[in-house]
Amino acid sequence: MAVLIETTLGDLIIDLFVKERPRCSLNFLKLCKKKYYNLNQFHSIERNYVAQTGDPTGTGKGGESVYSDMYGEQGRYFEREDLPKMRHTRMGIVSFVNNGDNMLGSQFFITLGENLDYLDDQHTIFGQVTEGLETLEKLNEQLADTNNRPFKDIRISHTIVLDDPFDEDARISFPPRSPSPTYEMLVKTDQIALDEKEDEDEGKTAEEIAEELQQREMAEQAQILEMVGDLKDADEVPPENVLFVCKLNPVTTDEDLEIIFSRFGKINNCEIVRDRRSGDSLQYAFIEFDNAKSCEQAFFKMDNVLIDDRRIHVDFSQSVSQNYKYKPKSQQQEAPKRRQSPQRRPEVKRSHQRSPSPRRRRSPSPKKDKKRDYRREPARRRRSSDNHRDRDRSYRDNNRDRRDNHRDSDRDRRRHDRSPDRRRDRR
């Protein structure tokens, strides 16, 4: 009463509790004999808990018992067996999965931990793993996602019944050979294949690994520059025919640098970068050659060369600004002329100035022919300081007039008080 299960991680031998669980043992043995579990996936693995399989769909919602061949649709699930009591006390216990209504189908799990007592009253134990505990250790070490689905594609490759104490039933059909894998199993999978290398650095030297890491860092930096807007495309590369020259003497000019580097080939552009305001040299320059070969020769020959009492440094340019540099009209390609359709009327060149309507045409006015008389032009606008000065002067004049008026009124009042008529009135 034993079954050999061959998995992609190793073999397992399961002994069945035929006397204690006869219906469960019959269901498991006949399903193994009819190759029902072949190519089934371990769709759920929880570390130190359980590894679940037995669902041909790989979703955890499918599967049916062998009694469906005997009794039809009503035998898809069968009632679980409770007695005698058995407990999940160690690694390697095999139990059928309860579908929620105390009914069992084809799905089963193998415990990967010890003392899992909370599984005793829910699921039905029908066997235990006697050989292949190292395979269970491998299952327990597998990494899984948040839904407990392993990243690796682990399957049951074959099942062999070593001992079957039950009689054969004519209603159960057994295939002559093991089923072949489907196209979805081989290609349409998002899991890691077993023959796929997990360690990408296996068989590589330290130099190759360091070079790959450097390339990854460069790609990450390029993507960051693209996101912040410094690069238009992360895969953009600088031109191969441009040299970067630094540590120049401030007195070195563009013409001198072009003459020195022109012996390696034709130079399209030689420019020393200067300060925008002062025009002083920033002591570095860009030299654009006609081809990449000349640029490479200059790189090997001119590095650390003495120019104007300065040891210059030469390197390939890493700037992509040359790709978007404005080209003068002499270097721009003219757009092809539009082809004239034979059915359309020939185009007539028109001036940008709109011709006046015949009704609006008038004879030229004699006033317009007169020369401009600058003597009648209005005076230029006064400055703001002049305006403020005039305003202050007018303010002082107004105050002076006001004081004079008050002084005159006081003088008249005193004269009136001194008059004889005013004195007579007081008496």
UniProtKB/Swiss-Prot annotation:
Transmembrane segments: none annotated. One of its GO terms (biological process) is positive regulation of oocyte development. The keyword Oxidoreductase does not apply. Residues 384-427 have a biased composition (Basic and acidic residues). One of its GO terms (molecular function) is peptidyl-prolyl cis-trans isomerase activity. It is found in: Nucleus, Nucleoplasm; Chromosome. Residues 351-370 have a biased composition (Basic residues). It is an enzyme of class 5 (isomerase). Its EC number is 5.2.1.8. It catalyses: [protein]-peptidylproline (omega=180) = [protein]-peptidylproline (omega=0). SMART domains: RRM (SM00360). Keywords: Chromosome, Coiled coil, Isomerase, Nucleus, RNA-binding, Rotamase, Transcription, Transcription regulation. Its main location: nucleus. Residues 322-334 have a biased composition (Polar residues). The keyword Metal-binding does not apply. Ubiquitous. Pfam families: Pro_isomerase (PF00160), RRM_1 (PF00076). Probable PPIase that accelerates the folding of proteins. It catalyzes the cis-trans isomerization of proline imidic peptide bonds in oligopeptides. Involved in RNA polymerase II (RNA pol II)-mediated transcription elongation, and in primary transcript splicing, including co-transcriptional trans-splicing, in association with the catalytic subunit of the RNA pol II complex ama-1. Also plays a role in the regulation of elongation-dependent phosphorylation of ama-1 to control transcription. Belongs to the cyclophilin-type PPIase family. PPIL4 subfamily. This is Peptidyl-prolyl cis-trans isomerase sig-7. The lineage of its organism: Eukaryota, Metazoa, Ecdysozoa, Nematoda, Chromadorea. The gene is sig-7.
